[in-house]
Design a protein with these regions (language model features):
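A structural signal for short beta-strand/turn segments enriched in small hydrophobics and glycine
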Residues: 70, 93, 99-101, 137-149
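Residue-level recognition of beta-strand microenvironments
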Residues: 73, 104-105, 132, 149-152
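Conserved, short, structured surface segments that act as functional micro-motifs
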Residues: 114-118, 138-195
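Zn2+-dependent peptidoglycan hydrolase active-site motif and core
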Residues: 80, 95-133, 159
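Short, glycine/small-residue-enriched coil/turn segments at secondary-structure junctions
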Residues: 56-62, 75-106
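Polar/charged, compositionally biased leader and regulatory segments
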Residues: 2-4, 8, 13-76, 181-207
């Protein structure tokens, strides 16, 4: 009987390991508002602002983890707050847009984490890094190194947990990045603050 129990426990442990390996974040299941320096309100002049990504040059943006594949997308049943990007491990993570470092260091379940605040009204977050390569207050150009892909915090595999945010609230990065082709989507991106405080994201495609 004890051998059957031992076999069952071994099977369950193996099964759980397989399930976790398919979705590397075991922690960041809800949209989280992080305590960082207050941002200039992008809605200070009205309930809407736009970003014309169609006019961005190659110097103004960079895919955050070149060569990566999506291991776990945004949202889903557990409300995953970011997009998990994965390479073979240890690769350099890069700034998606020009911006200022407003957080750099260990941050609870995120592990070694960096947040950049961009002039276009967005923030980007990079977490589970093995090492941060930037300091708070530093200004980065698009493509500058942010850190090294890792497994710090509560994560079961080496990867980058990447978030795009407005006013500290996460939205799907696939709205602005074509993850399959590692490209910025050429569009006029519109963010509207609704009367109940929620944010609505729409896009006008540009030929």
């Amino acid at each position: 009987m004890k051998y059957r129990i031992a076999f069952l426990l071994l099977f369950l442990n193996s099964f759980c390991s397989v399930v976790l390996s398919q979705d590397d974040d075991v922690d960041i299941d809800e949209w989280q508002v992080m305590k960082v320096e207050a941002a200039k309100d992008p809605f200070a002049n009205g309930s809407q602002f736009t970003i014309n990504f169609a006019n961005y040059t190659k110097e103004e943006w960079c895919y955050p983890l070149p060569g990566a594949k999506v291991n776990s997308p945004f949202g889903g049943a557990r409300h995953h707050s970011g997009t998990d990007l994965k390479t073979f491990g240890g690769d350099t993570i890069r700034a998606a847009f020009p911006g200022e470092v407003i957080l750099s260091g260990p941050y609870y379940a995120y592990g070694y984490c960096v947040i950049l605040r961009h002039a276009n009204g967005l923030e980007t977050l990079y977490s589970h890094q093995s090492r941060n390569l930037v300091k708070v207050g530093q200004w980065l150009h698009a493509g500058d190194p942010v850190g090294l892909e890792g497994q710090t915090g509560r994560a079961t595999g080496i990867h980058l947990h990447f978030e795009t945010r407005v006013n500290g609230r996460a939205f799907d990065s696939a709205r602005i990045f074509d993850h399959e082709n590692h490209a910025l989507i050429r569009q006029i991106f519109v963010v509207t603050k609704q009367k109940n405080g929620t944010l609505k994201f729409t896009a006008e495609q540009v030929e």
